[in-house]
């Protein structure tokens, strides 16, 4: 694997009225596990079903109903942990987190406080311009999702949909390593990318399948370094948690306004209360939801209905053997094998479907050309039509055929764009289009020379100007291309024009 090295970015510094402040951010990302059934029942996880139609007795908290672990959820959590280079714990356990809410019919959530299934890991978050932040993962644990309370269907009533109750979540908890709003958003993007490659979460933030709680605090310059040396969190300031963020843009906005709120409080002589807050994008502010609870407030205790979850190393090894190539490794291979730039490789590996499409079109010799066509022409056309790459009217084999025609000088780049448009709108194969429409590039130097001679003969005044200023030779090249319908080989045209005018 190619060794990609990056510099660590400086932390975001926010100027207060009295002094500068630095941001400290930790995140808890809740990712819905991609499985057909829930964590402890066989009820479907399908999104968009009729309210309260995907609910088993155990999900509804019916008396006497016992949870049964879904092995597929366990496998997906292990798979995610391996993808984040994390420690897999061969023994973990489930605990009850006790609290009351209408959409939590059991009166508790089954989670993993004391013995999570996955321990410490890491994720490299690339930030562009040769910068990257290594964010440490503290833990990943499995837990049940809650239901959904609906308050806008009736002015006097609230409704509860339990379809989501009991759906498996992976809570991915980071260390307080993130130092700017941009890094926070990029971190969630990278987690989402890795899980999409792994197939462990579909990453759909609109449906609530990926949500983030953001812990924000501020500290004076130099205090973070003291935390690093001592692991004493008091150096980092009092943190506030912003709940249920489901947009990269909102994550960044919420961090900005929350940091400024905390700075104003401290510089005004007050103290920041540790609490859970909600971001209101319409008002551009965070507002208090409740005081931030500690673990003892939830009276955690081991779930008596569930035995400890144990498996052996062979189970982990079997999952590891089935892991796909992940984004960082694929990016490095694209740079090494196809000669791509860091930027182009990043764009192509950002989405697994795009990466697979590119690989189906490229060879070692046409890698850069293929990347240019996929990124600029195909992506641009798909964006215009609001289509995803998996819905592309141009199949990878068709684009590969077009690229081969360009690489072999059968057609020019200009003609290739016309061929691409025809293929995109009709589905026809590029080779067939070129043959049928007579679009092959003119490479006969005799024919090109004749066209050049004719244009020179017809434009003596332009010849005189071009001989005084060689930069004007481009006018003759353009006229030859126009006369040949864009079919003349541009390289040959340039050479012949230069020879004729120079002579």
From Swiss-Prot:
Pfam family for this entry, one: GatB_N
GO BP annotations listed: glutaminyl-tRNAGln biosynthesis via transamidation; translation
Entries under PROSITE patterns matching the protein: GATB
Gene Ontology molecular function: asparaginyl-tRNA synthase (glutamine-hydrolyzing) activity; ATP binding; glutaminyl-tRNA synthase (glutamine-hydrolyzing) activity
Enzyme class per UniProt: ligase
EC number: 6.3.5.-
Catalytic activity entry: L-glutamyl-tRNA(Gln) + L-glutamine + ATP + H2O = L-glutaminyl-tRNA(Gln) + L-glutamate + ADP + phosphate + H(+); L-aspartyl-tRNA(Asn) + L-glutamine + ATP + H2O = L-asparaginyl-tRNA(Asn) + L-glutamate + ADP + phosphate + 2 H(+)
Annotated SUPFAM superfamilies: GatB/YqeY motif, Glutamine synthetase/guanido kinase
Signal peptide (from-to): none
Record's keyword terms, sorted: ATP-binding, Ligase, Nucleotide-binding, Protein biosynthesis
NCBIfam families: gatB (TIGR00133), PRK05477.1-2 (NF004012), PRK05477.1-4 (NF004014), PRK05477.1-5 (NF004015)
PANTHER family attached to this UniProt entry: GLUTAMYL-TRNA GLN AMIDOTRANSFERASE SUBUNIT B MITOCHONDRIAL AND PROKARYOTIC PET112-RELATED (PTHR11659), GLUTAMYL-TRNA(GLN) AMIDOTRANSFERASE SUBUNIT B, MITOCHONDRIAL (PTHR11659:SF0)
Record's function text: Allows the formation of correctly charged Asn-tRNA(Asn) or Gln-tRNA(Gln) through the transamidation of misacylated Asp-tRNA(Asn) or Glu-tRNA(Gln) in organisms which lack either or both of asparaginyl-tRNA or glutaminyl-tRNA synthetases. The reaction takes place in the presence of glutamine and ATP through an activated phospho-Asp-tRNA(Asn) or phospho-Glu-tRNA(Gln).
Family: Belongs to the GatB/GatE family. GatB subfamily.
Oligomeric and partner information: Heterotrimer of A, B and C subunits.
Name of the protein this chain belongs to: Aspartyl/glutamyl-tRNA(Asn/Gln) amidotransferase subunit B
Source organism per UniProt: Jannaschia sp. (strain CCS1)
């Amino acid at each position: 694997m190619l060794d990609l090295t990056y510099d660590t970015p400086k932390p975001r510094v926010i100027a207060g009225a009295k002094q500068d402040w630095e941001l400290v951010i930790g995140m808890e990302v809740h990712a819905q596990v991609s499985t057909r059934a829930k964590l402890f029942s066989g009820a479907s996880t399908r999104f968009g079903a009729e309210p309260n139609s995907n609910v088993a007795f155990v999900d509804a908290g019916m008396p006497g109903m016992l949870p049964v672990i879904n092995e597929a959820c366990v496998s997906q959590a292990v798979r995610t942990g391996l993808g984040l280079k994390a420690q897999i714990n061969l023994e973990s356990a489930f605990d009850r987190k006790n609290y009351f809410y209408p959409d939590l019919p059991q009166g508790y959530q089954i989670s993993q406080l004391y013995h999570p299934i996955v321990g410490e890991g890491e994720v490299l978050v690339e930030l562009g311009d040769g910068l990257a932040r290594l964010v440490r993962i503290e833990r990943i644990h499995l837990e049940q999702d809650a239901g959904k309370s609906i308050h806008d269907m009736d002015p006097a009533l609230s409704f509860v949909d339990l379809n989501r109750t009991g759906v498996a979540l992976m809570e991915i908890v980071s260390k307080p390593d993130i130092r700017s709003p941009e890094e926070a958003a990029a971190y969630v993007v990278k987690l989402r990318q890795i899980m999409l490659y792994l197939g462990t979460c579909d990453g759909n933030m609109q449906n609530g399948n990926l949500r983030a709680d953001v812990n924000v605090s501020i500290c004076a310059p130099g205090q973070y370094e003291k935390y690093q040396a001592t692991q004493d969190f008091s150096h980092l300031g009092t943190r506030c948690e912003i709940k249920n963020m489901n947009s990269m843009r909102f994550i960044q906005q919420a961090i900005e306004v929350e940091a400024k709120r905390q700075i104003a409080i401290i510089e005004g002589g007050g103290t920041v209360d540790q609490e859970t807050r909600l971001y209101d994008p319409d008002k551009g502010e965070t507002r208090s939801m409740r005081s931030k609870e500690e673990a003892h407030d939830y009276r955690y205790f081991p779930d008596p209905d569930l035995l400890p979850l144990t498996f052996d190393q062979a189970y982990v090894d079997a999952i590891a053997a089935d892991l796909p190539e992940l984004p960082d490794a694929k990016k490095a291979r694209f740079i090494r094998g196809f000669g791509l730039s860091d930027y182009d490789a990043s764009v192509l590996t950002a989405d697994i479907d795009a990466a697979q499409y590119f690989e189906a079109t490229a060879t070692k010799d046409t890698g850069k050309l293929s990347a240019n066509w996929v990124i600029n022409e195909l992506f641009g056309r798909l964006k215009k039509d609001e289509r995803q790459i998996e819905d592309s009217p141009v199949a990878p084999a068709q684009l590969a055929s077009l690229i081969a025609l360009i690489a072999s000088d059968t057609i020019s780049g200009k003609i290739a764009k016309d061929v691409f448009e025809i293929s995109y709108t009709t589905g026809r194969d590029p080779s067939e289009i070129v043959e049928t429409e007579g679009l092959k590039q003119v490479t006969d130097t005799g024919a090109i020379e004749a066209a050049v001679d004719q244009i020179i003969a017809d434009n003596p005044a332009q010849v005189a100007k071009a001989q005084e200023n060689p930069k004007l030779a481009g006018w003759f090249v353009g006229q030859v291309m126009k006369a040949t319908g864009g079919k003349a080989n541009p390289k040959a045209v340039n050479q012949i024009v230069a020879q004729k005018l120079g002579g």
